[in-house]
Structures are given as C-alpha cells and as structure tokens.
Amino acid sequence: ALSQQTAANHFDLVRFVPYSMPSLNIDMIDCHVDLFDHRFKWPVYINAMTGGTNKALEINTLLAKLAQACDLAIASGSLSAAIKDPSTKESFQTLRKHHPQGFIFANIGLSYDALGAQKAIDILHANALQVHLNAPQEIAMPEGDKDFTQWGKNLQSILSTVKVPVIVKEVGFGMSKETIHSLVNVGVNTIDVSGTGGTNFIQIENQRAGGGIQGLENYGFSTVESLLEAKNLDVCVLASGGVRNAYDVVKCLALGAKMVGLSRFFLDVVVEYPLEEAILRTKQFLTDIKHLMVILQCQTIADLTKKPLLFDPLLLSFLHQRQQ
C-alpha cells in the first residue's frame, strides 16, 4: 500500500501570496484547535491505518507511543476485524494502552449499525468515531460488499444512538458538495474529505488476482478539490489524503480544514526509524507548521483561513465547472 499513489493530490497547485516582513516569532504561534469539547494542542492527527494482525500490533504500538510523546490524537484502522474476531482486539487496544489519556478515534464501516459502532467505541474506550465511506473499494474487491442499500439506515442509526462525536470520512476518493449535502441532511456535522493522492485502494485491488476495475485509478476528487467543494457549507471539515508535509498541512488549514490527518508520514517515520528518532522527526514536523505560520504572518489557525491563495489553472477550471 505504501507505493500506491497515482491519483492527483493537487497541493502543489495551491500557492500562498508571500509576505516579506513578518513580525512574529515561534513562541507567539498558537496552533491549538477546539473541537469535540476537547482542546487539541496541534491541528494534526494520526489517521486510520491498520489493525487485526501481529504486524499491525507492532505498528499500532509504535504509533501510540509516538502519539503519546507528541500529544497527538490518533485513529485506529477499521475495527471490523476485532468485531468479527475478538482475538485480534489487542492489535487495536494497544492504542489505548500506550496512549491512555489521549484522544482516540475508533473506525468502522457502514456495513455496521449502531450496535457494531458501539462495539468499536467500547473496544478502544474511544473519544470519537470515524465512519468510513469506501464504496469504490468495496466494488473493486472480489470479496467486497456490493450492496449499499442499508448504508443510509445504518448511518442514521449510528448518529442517533452513539454518545461520542461522529466523523464521516472518505478513504481516498474525496467528497463532492453533493455528498456533503446528503450527509448534512441526515445530521452529520463533521466530515473528513480524504481525497486522492494518498493510498490508492483501486490500484491495490487492480493488482490483485480477480480484483479491481481497470481505468478507475484516478476516480475521485483530490483533497484540495474536496476542500473547495466544502467551502461555505454548514459542516466541520477535516482533511486527509496525500498530505505529505507541514506545508500541505498549512494549505489544508488555509482552505478551511479544522484539522488535518496524515497516515503515510507517521507510518514511514515509525517503520524507518527507532522510536526516539521518530519522535524527534515528528516534533520537527510540528515545529515546521509553526515556522510556516511565522513567515505567513499567521498567529492562529483562524489567521491562516484569511490568507489569499493562488490556484493553478487546473484548479481554476475545476472551480469554474463546479460553480455552474
């Protein structure tokens, strides 16, 4: 999965207007975010990745220790495996074991109703629940669920029953304004647009025997396009999908994201380096966000949302067509 990144991410098509006379220093920068009745120290979180195997136990333990050391929120991979096979629970519960006071998102798909969602929350003593939308992935998987007739009913069941905040997230195909409107209409108030540019599940399935849909590798909206789609809609927006570095994070925040999720960056750092080095590199990444805010003359996240942005003609064309 680490190499499956063929669809566009578009972050390089967004530019800030430079400002050459900043009057801030790093100690003046306030990166905190208030969300879900919680104050997050940083506007980034470790997004959903893995669980259910011995390797996942090892990786999730490292990610949880990293989150603990850097005061970051973290999301689990889909807890479907743990619900179906309780013997795999430990590979998920290591998140709470090693990040006992941390903010943890459980993750479940819409093949589950409120009962399954609550099981997922209980396994992690989770602070919030990600409900993922992955129809293209399911269609492309030979063993995937091809019947989505219960998705709407299950989502309404979850929204009306669970007591923790619910985030409806894509899994790398982005969200259109039509999707967002339909979610808001059933009571969703927080989304993670999760656009193209990160892990490409269609490409992964296309490389499996008997799976995939050829030609669908570039299906979806990029994270940037999805953030533009969500502009001025009555919903709290989180961003993920192909976010590579601190500069991409800052661009997401400027485009209106409340927080930004990264998977690849954090997975790479814990796989490639000893934990202490991974912690140092993560702290440098977080410091880079503040450094970028200094040169942009932005003391808070709210200041970033007021910065003028320049778009490449490709994005201007997208905006023009989507405003018709």
Regions found by a protein language model. Name each.
Residues 46, 67, 129, 191, ...:
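Conserved, mostly hydrophobic/aromatic
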Residues 150-272:
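Glycine-rich phosphate/ribose-binding loops and adjacent secondary-structure elements
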Residues 44-47, 72-77, 103-108, 131, ...:
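Hydrophobic faces of well-ordered beta-strands that scaffold small-molecule active sites
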Residues 55-57, 80-97, 111-116, 137-160, ...:
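Active-site-adjacent beta->alpha loops and helix N-cap segments on the catalytic face
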Residues 34-81:
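Active-site cofactor/substrate anionic-group-binding motifs, chiefly glycine-
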Residues 34-38, 62-69, 92-100, 118-125, ...:
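Acidic (Asp/Glu)-rich catalytic clusters
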Residues 1-2, 266-324:
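C-terminal extensions of enzymes
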Residues 1-36, 40, 314-315, 320-323:
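An N-cap/entry alpha-helix motif that binds or orients negatively charged groups
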